[in-house]
Amino acid sequence: MGLLVGISMLYFAANDWTQENLGLSGFSIRGISAWALSGEPNSTVIMVAAIALFIASIGKSGQFPLHTWLPDAMAGPTPVSSLLHSSTMVVAGVFLVARLYPVFFVGLDILGSGGNLIMFIGAITIVISAALAFVQNDIKRVLAYSTVSQLGYMMLGLGAGAWLPAVFHIFTHAFFKACLFLGAGSISHSASHHSFDMKRDMGGLRKVMPITFTTWIISTLALCGVFPFSGFFSKDEIIDNVGNNGYNTFMIVGLVGAFMTAAYMTRATYLTFFGEPRGASAGHSSHESHGAHGSHDTHGTHGDHDAHASHDAHASHGPHESGLLITAPLMILSVLALGSGLLNATPFGESWERMKLWVEPRAVEVVDSTFPGGPGESLFINVPSAEEGS
């Protein structure tokens, strides 16, 4: 409903202006963004439209208070969760705000006050979701609440005017969160008999699953924003930009959220890979009973026993490393979780800011005589191609 109301308001408010001045439809993102920055919009209309669109974004990206649905959407296969919760479905709301940023920039007076709706919702989501992640025993629910918290960082950055770091965090988050979800799937497949309960069926897996463990640690460090992993160059950049733009209270919230992220991921890592094996990871499962049936088979029906052994190799071998089909994506994603931050390594200087050249929109000639200057002036025109940015 929020999306429908927001789109309708923008179309009817901007259509005449965009067609007259730019020859574009009122549904054109370029036209709407240009209209938002032109000084023409009625302040009430653009504010209500921005709020309506943001309500839609809250629902789509699982922000507070509509954050509870996302962890419940874990019933599907882990590769599906990996795609949907790292880089595709749930970031759509954040991308909507980023893509129509001039509407929010003007409508919610970003950088013009002590805070705005986007920042408040993002900050609340960061803390609440991190706290909920800390008390989960299901490893996929930990990662789901972690995703909600990271989406809160993206929203906080957009609300504070840190457009590029927020968009860059979408990029880096895709790699390390996908790796973490697939790591959880690897554990479920090869160690815990398809259980995701860390307390009941995991523990002590670091030695029997070295590849899964190593890739998990790399992605965890990226999620926690540890240098030189990719999260340092995106999430920490958001926190730094929030502080530099004068929102010190929100910067503190971001720092608290970073410590909470480290806390719940340390807990999840310890319960999964350290300590004594528990439950399925210790070899305790209903599959053990099949061995007894085999010992009572005195009539030479070895075919049934062989069929069962081939049917459930996991039970006979106990916890073990997953095959190449599972570990190869983990290794690829872990490399990207480590190195993708270098595409916009702001602390190293402007020559390292490649992502800025590729995705930051630029103004073209038409704006010179039509639009006033100011922050965000260039955000409505074409995104340059990689060739133009090279």
For the regions a protein language model found, what residue spans apply to each?
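...captures the hydrophobic TM-helix bundle architecture rather than a specific catalytic motif
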Residues: M1-G349, S369, G373, S378-S390
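Membrane-proximal cytoplasmic C-terminal regulatory module of class A 7TM GPCRs
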Residues: G349-D368
